[in-house]
């Protein structure tokens, strides 16, 4: 008996996973026992950006040398640039072969040159075993066959893929061919270049991520509308430039949502602020569609502003327990009262940025230095010069809140921030915990920051936690 045959099946299988398809085919003649174990290949990967990878043609020949009974679990293909005159034909021959071998996960990262055209083989859309399919990037899908069916597919990822079916909606055909789809990730999309029905529809979908590729300074964006018909969706991460409207929004099962809208140039949230030729998108239906969420993250200040200008559409969030809002130091908090008044069961409020101040007061309130009582001796500020912005008025909207936890993600300990915290601690009668995240400083400043905050009056049950975050490396 040779030494390899004396190893356990698990060890041999692990060794096999590191071999190329061609080498494995040669090695499979070592013994009958090896051949039996090699009926399943855990991973098959090709990446022509790596040294000594060889050509796709060689890789294909190695695959064809495997016994027809060999099954392959995971396949990953990364192709950049040109790889021989028959690169597209070789790639499709390779895909047609592996898709007959019971593949569970297929990842394609294919760059298509601008002067070339490439079409995926029909077999990609009719594979009965695929559980996860990832398509990218700079890939164009012109046609999804009428007989498309991916009966086992649960996860679909499309990255920088463009759909442009002239005879119908290839994107919706693809979704309709996935009867048990659970998760859809749409990354680096550019709707404005798609030819589609502007509809995301799936009765089984539970997790959805949509991420628009945004170019800074982009002025051309004229999407008519996007419809969400996803009644089983529980998790939504939506990063986009807002279309003109959201005709239909069916998100009745939604539990958690992260919304990040970026308003392009020549767009305005309200006609009052629009200039001639500006587009005024309506997010009313999108806001109403979020009514059942338990966790809501408004992760851009443009999104927070959209809620303010559409405040009449804000529903009562009966199930909302955790709310996160993005802030900037000079960004007005006028949306916050509307959100808190419509969230009767809110328990956790996360301020995703610095605390807001009345920047129009100027000197003394822009300072990033930690407040010290000695500063008062050098100031002659009148009590009438309240640095709190009018958007928060007297903070009376906090008095009816049941919030138990407040998190501040960027706390500097300045005088204005202490005034903010004083209002939070006084008005939030149910407050039990304040979490403060601040950048690392020297020990003396740490002590000063802690002391200032801990000395503020509060309920006896309210505790304060501090976490000092190290600065990001510039490397």
Swiss-Prot record:
InterPro entries: F-box-like_dom_sf, F-box_dom, FBD, FBL60-like, LRR_dom_sf, LRR_FXL15/At3g58940/PEG3-like. SMART domains: FBD (SM00579). Residues 1-49 form the F-box domain. Pfam families: F-box, LRR_At5g56370. Transmembrane segments: none annotated. This is Putative F-box protein At3g58960.
